[in-house]
A protein has these predicted regions:
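Phosphate-handling catalytic cores of nucleic-acid transaction enzymes
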Residues: 1-195
């Protein structure tokens, strides 16, 4: 798993290559299932405060507990499965999801991205179970799955936004030019400001 950030210009190039069959069309981009494309506020707001100490301590306790888990072996596998109720919810989500990604409406690059969610959704539910309900004898309940599905709903909007960077004609340059003209920062060939 990777966490981090990237500048929009860099990701635009990667997405264009992935969508247009260039060097970036190697499946790597589709593996960033937790990719988000947040809005940038135009007004800067300084936030300088002490971290929430109890929340920080609770998070570290989870990290320490997860770090103490014994890894599975061939002789002693650790199996987690959905409860019957969670399995029913998963199928209720999966069937229309699979139908949707097999349709004609979505770009193939976005379909490749979303197809990875067959694994991502159960993986998120497992993470939530390991964090919040680790003593359930390897059973992932509907609460953890519903949270994973809520994440999927949120992540889908960001995936669509990510791929739209290459699928919708680029207008960033036009917006920048218009801002300079409106701001009185653009001159003609004789040095006269445009209005």
């Amino acid at each position: 798993a990777m966490l981090g950030g990237i500048r929009p210009g860099k990701v635009h190039a990667s997405v264009r290559e992935a969508v247009n069959g260039g060097a970036g069309d190697d499946g790597l981009l589709q593996r960033f299932g937790l990719a988000v494309w947040p809005d940038v506020e135009r007004e800067f707001k300084l936030v300088d405060r002490w971290p929430d100490t109890p929340a920080k301590q609770a998070a570290w306790a989870v990290f320490e507990r997860l770090n103490g888990l014994l890894p599975a072996t061939d002789d002693d596998p650790q199996e987690w499965r959905f409860s019957p109720e969670a399995q029913a919810i998963f199928y209720e989500w999966l069937i229309p999801f699979e139908t949707g990604i097999r349709g004609e409406e979505l770009h193939p690059a976005l379909v490749s991205h979303l197809a990875k969610w067959r694994k991502l959704i159960p993986a998120l539910a497992l993470i939530f179970a390991l964090v919040d309900t680790p003593d359930t004898n390897g059973v992932i309940h509907e609460g953890e799955l519903i949270r994973a599905l809520a994440w999927a709903e949120y992540l889908r909007t960001h995936a669509e936004r990510l791929y739209a960077a290459a699928l919708i004609p680029e207008t960033t340059g036009a917006h920048a030019l218009l801002a300079k003209i409106k701001g009185g920062k653009l001159c003609d060939g004789d040095g006269v400001l445009w209005e």
